[in-house]
UniProtKB/Swiss-Prot annotation:
Residue ranges occupied by any Globin domain in the UniProt entry: 1-141
Official protein name in the record: Hemoglobin subunit alpha
Primary role: Involved in oxygen transport from the lung to the various peripheral tissues.
Recorded superkingdom: Eukaryota
Any one annotated GO CC term: haptoglobin-hemoglobin complex
Record's keyword terms, sorted: Acetylation, Heme, Iron, Metal-binding, Oxygen transport, Phosphoprotein, Transport
Binding-site positions, O2: H58
Length: 141
């Protein structure tokens, strides 16, 4: 459960990301593909090389979904219901991959906003991404 402080930290950090969300989303995906190469199996039709237009486009989708989630911290299940259905029923993404991408996103954010990536912000963003992952995998059961 996200506390009031967590919600404030998440909104503030996401505000610092600003117009770079799509870029950071793509960078996190690229990082995931390099560090966890088995994740590429979910993107057989993608060019997963550095700078790929397909990775950039999917990074924007990830960033847009997270921006939606940041705007609906009190109702993540409602805000992400369609995305949860998509990943559970059509894409059938292994739930562990959400954790891997979350980790890569945290590393990416720490790299780009180091002054604002305090231990408290790190903890809040980690809880947020874990909550998003839980919602996205909730319909697997």
């Amino acid at each position: 459960v996200l506390s009031g402080e967590d919600k404030n930290n998440i909104k503030t950090a996401w505000g610092k990301i600003g117009g770079h969300a799509a870029e950071y989303g793509a960078e996190a995906l690229e990082r995931m593909f390099v560090v966890y190469p088995t994740t590429k199996t979910y993107f057989p039709h993608f060019d997963v090389s550095h700078g790929s237009g397909q990775v950039k486009a999917h990074g924007k989708k990830v960033a847009d979904a997270l921006t939606t989630a940041v705007g609906h911290l009190d109702d993540l299940p409602g805000a992400l219901s369609a995305l949860s259905d998509l990943h559970a029923h059509k894409l059938r993404v292994d739930p562990v991959n959400f954790k891997l991408l979350s980790h890569c996103l945290l590393v990416t954010l720490a790299n780009h906003i180091p002054a604002d990536f305090t231990p408290a912000v790190h903890a809040s963003l980690d809880k947020f991404l874990a909550s998003v992952s839980t919602v996205l995998t909730s319909k697997y059961r």
